[in-house]
Amino acid sequence: MSLNDYVKAQKLGEKRYQAALSKNEYPYLPVLDELITNSDIAGEVNLGLQHISLDRVVGTATKGRTTAFASNFMPILDANSEFGNKWSSLCDSHIEEGIHDPIKVYEYMNKFYVIEGNKRVSVLKYFGADSVPAMVIRKLPKRTDEPENKIYYEFVDFHKQTGINYIWFTQLAGYDKLREYIGCLLYTSPSPR
């Protein structure tokens, strides 16, 4: 069993936990249920199976598991706990055959919050994986005049048209320019003979 890996991951978690406390920051995973309310949401869209960047997986959907992880998704519970044993077993499975089962997440403002699969995310982040398969439910915020909200809705349109979900702009019109560029490439590339 990968108890050694758990202990290493736990040390990374403890380091992040202590660093957050020293800066007066919340030391655990952000909880989507605590960040938004139903009145903040215009609707939900089931996006189905997607590959998502682990860098964009930032928290958990509900408070239930949040104190098992530091804010970097590394475990902080005792290695000899049931949680530690399950994490270690999942680590063994990942080493032997990989993690194939998709996690389930909410996407909100192009960040992902785990509904099911926190330990899978933790193990994959520990091993430095780039992405994870996920069943994604998008929570659409109500439209506002805030620049971040406008950029997000540009992203939603871009994602709907291209399927690309791993590019994030911080200024308005970035997605329009990229869409024009992609369209230009599609229409100017030489046709096969």
Q: Model-predicted segments: where are they?
A:
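Glycine- and acidic-residue-rich phosphate-binding/metal-coordinating active-site segment common to enzymes
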Residues: Y108-K111, I115-L178
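Conserved small/polar residues in nucleotide/adenosyl-binding loops
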Residues: Y187-P192
